[in-house]
Amino acid sequence: MATAAAASNKFESFFETTLEDADPEIFGAIRNELGRQRHEIELIASENIVSRAVLEAQGSIMTNKYAEGYPGKRYYGGCQFVDVAEELAIERAKKLFGCNFANVQPNSGSQMNQAVFLALLQPGDTFMGLDLNSGGHLTHGSPVNMSGKWFKVVSYGVRKEDHLLDMDAIEKTAHETKPKLILAGGTAYSRIWDWKRFREIADAVGAYLMVDMAHIAGLVAGGVHPSPLPHAHVVTTTTHKSLRGPRGGMILCNDEDIAKKMNSAVFPGLQGGPLMHVIAAKAVAFGEALKPSFKVYAESVAANAKALASSLKETGLDIVSGGTDNHLMLVDLRPKNATGKRAEAALGRANITCNKNGIPFDPEKPFVTSGVRLGTPAGTTRGFGQAEFREIGKLIAEVLDGLKIANSDEGNAAVEAAVKAKVVALTDRFPLYPYLG
């Protein structure tokens, strides 16, 4: 009896011991990260803040279940309830974006794009993608990425005079190189994409049109940016960023044959068992995005971006392409004699989080850069409006002006401390996850 009682107590401990007691080091890191998120202004364009419901789904017992395959066609038993979660995620994604097919299993943005390449291309095939220096992504053909190693990549870019896509030049290049696939979309392009023109170019050369809308999916869902689904053969998107869900990816399309190829490419082509706790959280996020309040959110994200860009321009900074039509902007720091590396560090010391980013035709090295990329999704989720983002623009300028005076990597401690105090006062007005204590 004593042995049985001891065994029972051991298992009770396993199931009931809190993270704080079981692993104080990880618990401490999580609490510190919560404090950072609460007291810093998050301007990284690819980041957002999920709801309590999404957190609960992602932290659920769904993490225990293996479910190789697809709903109704699994290689494991006991999948009847995870099937419900995945089917809900699929149906909600289809409704949200008005498409016929959705694969919600990709674990990341890189994997969703790899799946499309696996489905539609052969090694050595030619595809076109936006150059990294013009706002593209590593998976759009960068030579250091699989996409640039396995395929012949023809990059297109923006015009030097206005930093906008030159559709005539893209069309000319497509006719000259005859790509099998044209990839539209990017991570640092702040203007509206002309999906219709891209499809016309693709059709003229017999290419697939693939759109990576990872950054703007939330704006598409909210009706703020035109949808690529009526035009593209296949669309990929992450489920976080402006869509405000858990970190992951998905693939959307309207053609049944392409959908079958995508499903085979994801599983068994690239992945094994899907992350069912993440898929459950995706379903929750898609359900949130289907509510009328999400349209208001998306509209606010875009309006706040315009307010921030306008405020920054008033302080003497340049915005690449002159402004923004979506959630992000590239800020040219050269008017303040700053580099992206120095600015990111100085702003970080003032509790403003962003990332250094190259600008088109940047003379600086990739780890230095002449710019920073800023975005409004996380701040908008928190409750910031246009007034707050105009204030944030001024705070950024204060830090950069102090940095210009100091002219060193160490920055201007007095200015940064003063701005940090203002940032904390602002964030305290918009509490984050108060139920966590």
Swiss-Prot record:
Family annotation (CDD domains): SHMT
EC number: 2.1.2.1
Keywords from the named record: Amino-acid biosynthesis, Cytoplasm, One-carbon metabolism, Pyridoxal phosphate, Transferase
GO CC annotation terms, alphabetical: cytosol
Cellular localization per UniProt: Cytoplasm
Binding site for (6S)-5,6,7,8-tetrahydrofolate: L132, G136, H137, L138
Residues the UniProt record annotates as site (Plays an important role in substrate specificity): H240
Pfam families on file: SHMT
SUPFAM superfamilies per record: PLP-dependent transferases
Keyword Lyase included in the entry's annotation: no
Protein's UniProt keywords contain Amino-acid biosynthesis: yes
Alphabetical GO biological process terms: glycine biosynthetic process from serine; tetrahydrofolate interconversion
Entry coiled-coil feature ranges: none
Cofactor entry: pyridoxal 5'-phosphate
Principal place of residence: cytoplasm
General function of this protein: Catalyzes the reversible interconversion of serine and glycine with tetrahydrofolate (THF) serving as the one-carbon carrier. This reaction serves as the major source of one-carbon groups required for the biosynthesis of purines, thymidylate, methionine, and other important biomolecules. Also exhibits THF-independent aldolase activity toward beta-hydroxyamino acids, producing glycine and aldehydes, via a retro-aldol mechanism.
Alphabetized HAMAP family for the sequence: SHMT
Similarity field: Belongs to the SHMT family.
Protein name: Serine hydroxymethyltransferase 1
Gene name of this polypeptide: glyA1
